[in-house]
Amino acid sequence: MVTKRVQRMMFAAAACIPLLLGSAPLYAQTSAVQQKLAALEKSSGGRLGVALIDTADNTQVLYRGDERFPMCSTSKVMAAAAVLKQSETQKQLLNQPVEIKPADLVNYNPIAEKHVNGTMTLAELSAAALQYSDNTAMNKLIAQLGGPGGVTAFARAIGDETFRLDRTEPTLNTAIPGDPRDTTTPRAMAQTLRQLTLGHALGETQRAQLVTWLKGNTTGAASIRAGLPTSWTVGDKTGSGDYGTTNDIAVIWPQGRAPLVLVTYFTQPQQNAESRRDVLASAARIIAEGL
C-alpha cells in the first residue's frame, strides 16, 4: 500500500522530471497557441517548428517540437559556445590570432573578407559568426574545435543528445528534406540555448560574453524581434539555407518578467523557395500574445 507520505515523495520527484527531460507542463492556453501556429504553417506552405521555454515557471509551448529541422547558421551558437568553453581553461585563447587566407573565403564573408592575408582573433571570429553570420568565421571556429564532430561532442558534453553538426559552411545549409545532417529539434535547441545563456553550461564570464554577442546580432530585425514588443530585449541568431529554410533562435528579456527562450525553425518543399522571415515574426507574435 502506498502511503500519503510516499505519494508526496513520488509527486515531488516527478516534479523534477520536466527540468531533466525538458517535458515541462504546458500553458493552459497552449492548445489555442498551437492552433494559431498550425494555421500560420498552413498558410505559409512550409513546415514550422517552435519551442518556447518560460523560465518563470519552466512551462513550454511546442509545435513540432521533436521533429528535426536543418539548423543552418543557428548552429554557430554552439560552435562559439564550444570555443568559449575551451577558453575557461585556456585563458588567452580568445586573443589567439587565426590567419585568414584568400582560399578560406566561402560564399558569405562580410567580416573575414576584410582581413584576408591578415589575422582575426578567436573572439573576433566568434563575434563575426554570431553577429554577422560570417561563414568563413564559422569555419575557423569549427577548425579550432577539430571539425564538425568537435562541435557535436561539445553538445553532448552539455547534455544535448539531439544536435548534430556534420559539415562546414556552406554545405551545412543544403537543408534537404529528410536529411538528418546538420539538424536538431526545436525542443532540444531551446533547452540548450537556455543552458548556454541562462544556465551553467558555461562559466559566468563566458556566459556573459555569449549573451553580449547575441544581443549585438545585426541580422535578426525582421525575424523573432519583429514579432515582439520593442521594449523587450532580445539576443538571437538567425539562419537560412536551401528550401527556403529560415530560422531564428532567441533569448528574450520581456519587461517585468523572467526571460524566455524561443526557437523558430521553418523550411519549405521547394529547393529554390524564398526565405520567410515574416513567418518567424508571426510565430513570435503568436507566442507573445499567448503569454
Swiss-Prot record:
Residues 1-28 form the signal peptide. It catalyses: a beta-lactam + H2O = a substituted beta-amino acid. Extended-spectrum beta-lactamase (ESBL) which confers resistance to penicillins, as well as first, second, and third-generation cephalosporins. Has cefotaxime-hydrolyzing activity. The class A beta-lactamase family has a specific amino-acid numbering system, sometimes called Ambler or ABL numbering and often misspelt as Amber. A multiple sequence alignment was used to derive a consensus sequence and then the consensus was numbered taking into account insertions and deletions. This allows use of identical numbers, e.g. for active site residues, despite differences in protein length. UniProt always uses natural numbering of residues, hence there appear to be differences in numbering between this entry and some papers. This is Beta-lactamase CTX-M-14. The keyword ATP-binding does not apply. Keywords: Antibiotic resistance, Hydrolase, Secreted, Signal. Its main location: secreted. InterPro entries: Beta-lactam/transpept-like, Beta-lactam_cat, Beta-lactam_class-A, Beta-lactam_class-A_AS. A beta-lactam binds at K76, S133, E169, S240. The active site is at S73 (nucleophile). One of its GO terms (biological process) is beta-lactam antibiotic catabolic process. Inhibited by the beta-lactamase-blocking agents clavulanic acid, tazobactam and sulbactam. Monomer. It is found in: Secreted. GO terms for molecular function: beta-lactamase activity. Its EC number is 3.5.2.6. GO terms for cellular component: extracellular region. Gene3D superfamilies: DD-peptidase/beta-lactamase superfamily. The keyword Signal applies. Changing A80V: Slightly reduces resistance to cefalotin in RB791 strain, but has little effect on resistance to ampicillin, cefotaxime or ceftazidime. Very little effect on catalytic efficiency. Increases steady-state expression level in RB791 strain. Pfam families: Beta-lactamase2. Belongs to the class-A beta-lactamase family. The gene is bla.
